[in-house]
Amino acid sequence: MGVLCFGASNILLCAEDSSSVLGLGGFGGGGGEVAAELGCGGGGGFDFFGFGGGAVFPIDSDEFVALLVEKEMDHQPQRGYLEKLELGGLECSWRKDAIDWICKVHSYYNFGPLSLYLAVNYLDRFLSSFNLPHDESWMQQLLSVSCLSLATKMEETVVPLPMDLQVFDAEYVFEARHIKRMELIVMKTLKWRLQAVTPFSFIGYFLDKFNEGKPPSYTLASWCSDLTVGTLKDSRFLSFRPSEIAAAVVLAVLAENQFLVFNSALGESEIPVNKEMVMRCYELMVEKALVKKIRNSNASSSVPHSPITVLDAACFSFRSDDTTLGSSQSNSNNKDYNSQDSAPASKRRRLNTTPI
């Protein structure tokens, strides 16, 4: 492919931390002290993927998690969005096509699981807030590229050039300036809240609570990551808060590995989430057989899979064989394109005029 950008020289590379989610920064330096008192980030966590920058499950204090729960809905789609998706309108088709494409590119570059989750989060929040044009088919592809580009800039240490993200059935080829303009539109629509609260913000906390403070194994952390990204495609999971999804994920994984009984553990716990919604989320996971898919996937191979394995088969053929789950390193030496999967740029439509 093309040249990869190392370092932070690329435009719009973001440097937010968890304190920025709660607005704890930017107050004469005092924000960092407040965040430290609350147990915000940097206070330890489970790093199973060896990289950090989205690969760590932080163990935050009860007070800080309570603040995250209070703020998490600020990073969710607008009200009424799920109903629009259920009606099968334009938002539904855009979402499906965009997630399918994002999954393929995410797996191709072997990005981390949080990058995938953030890209879909940006997509959903944008679609819920923006009036979509019916006669601008190119915009759906440009939006997909921009959301994934922003997510990788937030979480990855090796960030491909925007042009290099445009692979796998890309009908149009957008110039970097068009992608950057769309990124600005997305960020403005999202009110510049890119360091979103996601289920990954809570998984370390719930693992610590439900696993009696014992560090979980690589397998448990891997399953939690897989199950979390496995909820992305089904829009019904949008009815749950990130904290509720995280609690359901951790309990489901621990129950599957016979560390606890789901119902009793949930009932006896003192966690700052709606237990009824956690149970409903778990029941939807069972209905979708997500845990079963993860178990079968892990049983079929001794090599840890990418989190993408719990998504549909359309993504499977593009999965990396890297032994590190959620690795953010791009195996640039192994990027030989399959002519059936990625058409040459010369055969795809290039927008010479400014689309936005």
UniProtKB/Swiss-Prot annotation:
Species whose genome carries this gene: Oryza sativa subsp. japonica (Rice)
One MF term in the entry's GO annotations: cyclin-dependent protein serine/threonine kinase regulator activity
Family: Belongs to the cyclin family. Cyclin D subfamily.
Pfam families hit by this protein: Cyclin_C, Cyclin_N
Record's protein name: Cyclin-D2-2
CDD domains listed in its UniProt record: CYCLIN_AtCycD-like_rpt1, CYCLIN_AtCycD-like_rpt2
Location of the region described as Disordered in the Swiss-Prot/TrEMBL record: 325-356
Biased composition (Polar residues): 325-343
One of the GO biological process terms: G1/S transition of mitotic cell cycle
UniProt keywords, alphabetically: Cell cycle, Cell division, Cyclin
GO cellular component, one term: nucleus
Annotated Basic residues bias: 346-356
Superkingdom assignment: Eukaryota
